[in-house]
Design a protein with these regions (language model features):
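Polytopic endomembrane small-metabolite transporters, centered on the Drug/Metabolite Transporter
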Residues: 1-356
């Protein structure tokens, strides 16, 4: 009987994890955009999100809710400097991107994450992509240019520039994460803890240096101009709380998602998320979705879905080709140890075309 219930439980677990990621990702974009429309302090907003996530990590650790106890080691911090630096820059650029473009255009502005990631793996890891992978990247790139240059409504080129820069940093970050996991002995939980904590600390001098202090003071003690009965401070606080909590929960759920989801489920959820984000942008913020913008999003999703399918096929082929060496190992004619899928492929399969 337990064996009969196991497949049903597994299906429910997959549905639960995928649904959570879908809802959380959409809520993050909408909440971020709502706050960024009302504030001139995007870096302080990012700091508040990370600070709330850190508090939740500490509370969960105190209540023994995490599988591992949280630690703090200076040598570990030093080893994570490259990743934390890229994380801070990438998240900051993502917020600036969302502040300058419509929510429905955000996915297009950051549409070059996948092509940049493939190029980064070629440059830094010397991993040559297959022809089909190059074709998938070409589709995504074409979708980006359709949205930027062939749409009837011209987007903010400042926002597009931030989006391209953010995509490049995200791509390099996905390469660096492999070495960073080794620093924390392969623990995704510890990596998330250190990343949130150190990123929050690093952001403090940054938002001071870029001149956000006057905006922060105005937000905290200035005159309140109510918008639909809600003040900018209330919007900021609620937005920080919602996105901070969701960011923490997504960090925890990522431990589970790697185990229970497949590239195919990711492909489907990414497509649904892309369409839903556009619809929410139109509904919540009155975004204009032209035929050019819709075509751009569709092409990017098609290229991303094709990439995910190709990576799945290539991993399956690699698994089949390993059967012969494994057989020879059983016969005593040699040894073979099957290698796990590269962390980079897992990260790319999970994120697709990031927006944090």
């Amino acid at each position: 009987m337990p064996h009969q219930n196991e497949p049903k439980s597994s299906r429910l677990l997959v549905i639960g994890v995928v649904s959570f990621y879908l809802v959380a990702a959409l809520a993050m974009v909408v909440a971020n955009k709502k706050v960024l429309n009302e504030t001139t302090t995007p870096l302080f907003f990012l700091f508040c999100q990370l600070f709330i996530a850190v508090i939740l990590f500490l509370a969960s650790d105190a209540l023994r809710l995490l599988p591992d106890r949280l630690t703090f080691d200076i040598n570990t911090c030093k080893g994570l400097v490259p990743m934390v630096s890229l994380n801070v820059v990438g998240l900051s650029l993502s917020n600036y991107t969302l502040a300058h473009v419509d929510a429905s255009f955000y996915q297009v502005a950051r549409g070059l994450v996948l092509p940049f990631t493939v190029v980064a793996t070629l440059v830094f890891l010397h991993s040559t992509p297959s022809v089909r992978i190059i074709l998938a990247c070409s589709l995504v790139t074409a979708g980006f240019f359709v949205g930027v240059f062939l749409d009837g409504v011209r987007p903010s080129m400042v926002g597009v520039a931030f989006g391209v820069a953010s995509s490049l940093i995200t791509a390099i970050h996905s390469v660096v994460i492999k070495k960073s996991l080794a620093v924390v002995n392969g623990s995704a939980l510890m990596l998330s803890w250190y990343t949130n904590l150190l990123s929050a600390i690093v952001l403090i001098p940054i938002f001071i240096l870029v001149g956000e202090v006057p905006g922060i003071m105005k937000l905290l003690v200035g005159e309140f101009t109510a918008v639909d009965g809600t003040s900018p401070l209330q919007i900021f606080l609620w937005g920080s709380l919602i996105t901070g909590c969701l960011g923490f929960l997504m960090s925890i759920a990522s431990l589970l998602s790697i185990k229970v989801t497949s590239p195919i489920t990711h492909m489907i959820s990414s497509a649904v998320r892309g369409v839903a984000a556009s619809m929410l942008g139109k509904w919540c913020f009155g975004d204009i979705i032209t035929s050019g913008r819709a075509s751009s999003i569709g092409i990017i999703l098609l290229g991303s879905a094709y990439y995910t399918w190709v990576k799945h096929q290539e991993s399956q082929s690699g698994a089949k080709s390993s059967e012969a060496p494994q057989a020879s190992s059983r016969d005593g004619r040699g040894s073979y140890e099957r290698v796990k899928m590269d962390e980079l492929d897992l990260e790319a399969a999970r994120k697709g075309t990031k927006p944090e």
